[in-house]
Amino acid sequence: MKQLAAQPLPSRGLEDTLRRGNVWWQGERIFGLPPIRRWAFPHVLSNVTGGGLAPVTVVRGPRQIGKTTLLNQVIDDLLTQGVLPKRIFRVQFDELPELAKVSQPILDLAWWYSDNVLGKSFHQAARDGEQALLFLDEVQNLPDWAPQLKHLVDQHPVHVVVTGSSALRIEAGRDSLAGRIATLEMGPLLLREIGEMRGYGKIEPYLPSNGLGPLKDKDFWLGLREFGERHREFRLRAFSAFSQRGAYPIAQARADASWEQIADQLNETVIRRAIQHDLRMGAKGKRRDEHLLEEVFRLGCRYVGQSPNQALYLDEIRRAMHANIGWQRILTYLKFLDGTLLLRLIEPLELRLKRRRGASKLCLCDHALRAAWLQEVVPLDPDELERQPHLTDLAGHIAESAAGYFLRSIVNLDVAHFPERNAEPEVDYVMTIGEQRIPIEVKYRRRIDHRDTVGLRAFTEKAVYNAPFGVLVTLGEEAASDDPRIVSVPLSTFLMMR
């Protein structure tokens, strides 16, 4: 693994591909980068330029949400700042099948780059003030990527940015890279990013990026409600765009394209790409059942925001596939889909002395995927729902899913759901921060009465849960409860938090 013992690349074609993928080495710049930068941009840029504590920054998220664009924008900004082009090396691994012939692709490519482009060892480059910056896109399908990266950053002074669209494989690498890694989870567009992309203005996030502490303070949530009211016009316009087309960048950037075109694009480049490419091969090269993956994902879309039990899954799958499929296999495939970050399984809250009961709640990364896959458009916008009241119940489940995925994507935030237990009513979500818990209930309907807050009130009344207040996420703008322990926030304002 010594740097000076670099092995030649397996083909001249691979070297040509690498050079063409790093056009700045020839004095050129990347063409067609969007002017709008996603929320993760300043964090990645800061980490690359030495502002972070870890040498490796991992950006994970579903396919087609802008991870590669983010890397290219960071590279372009570095070049604008005057960083020498030869210091920057980018590799897009999912477009290099020839790497299958390379035993340790990350290390071999790093040594090749050091010898043939940087022209010196990584240590000498750092001493000369030319520390190498490596951008490794979609590494999750590489065997043993994490141990290779660990060796690289342990032995050589480099900064590395890694992207991946598999939570399972990226998470598996975190153990090898403990203490060397900073993780960012980037999902589809945030509501304020949708507004900026559509030209409605630009708003800074309400939640600071330096920790979860503010979430424990009731005044934070009251302030969030005021924040939403202060930016009402922007918020409602952005939420209407989100309701119509979802939060994938392609859907909002191409507002001129028809929904049918966008749906076809999402089905092919996001859902089928994940099922046919990311999940097609299991352990030891065994192929997974593509049809079963599609059916399990279809159920995830159909029961979004809900917690189906085993019997429902078994019955639906057997009817769809005319085969006797066992629960463990279905559960395994659900976890595979969770690994693609297209949907997240929110587990039931575990409490001391109480055996965990209840099924996982299904939260889809974007309701547009459901609309595309099931060919069933359900609006979230209050005005649209008033015109189509028969869709209100479905919209409620989708709103619950949107809130759950939004919470689950906040790094280091512990989120669970609270199933009905004996005499204790259900609560949609429970955030745990340190010793404190914050229950969250989503009630996406026009009228909310005392019965709709029974779960929040029961949870906050039990001293053992240490929940001084709860949050009620609503459809309408008006305060939905006069209980001083409950802060009501419209879904559109809730999604403006980040």
Model-predicted segments: where are they?
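Accessory nucleic acid-recognition modules appended to NTPase machines
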Residues: K2-Q3, P8, Q252-Q436
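A short, basic N-terminal segment
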Residues: M1-L53
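Hydrophobic positions on the alpha1 helix immediately C-terminal to the Walker A/P-loop
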Residues: L70
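Conserved lysine of the Walker
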Residues: K67
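Conserved catalytic segments around the Walker B and adjacent sensor/switch elements
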Residues: T80-E95
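Interdomain motor-coupling "hinge/lid" segment immediately C-terminal to the ATP-binding subdomain
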Residues: G173-R302
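Short glycine-rich substrate-engagement loop in P-loop NTPases that contacts/grips substrate
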Residues: V91-G129
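Domain-level recognition of nuclease-like catalytic cores that cleave nucleotide substrates
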Residues: L475-R498
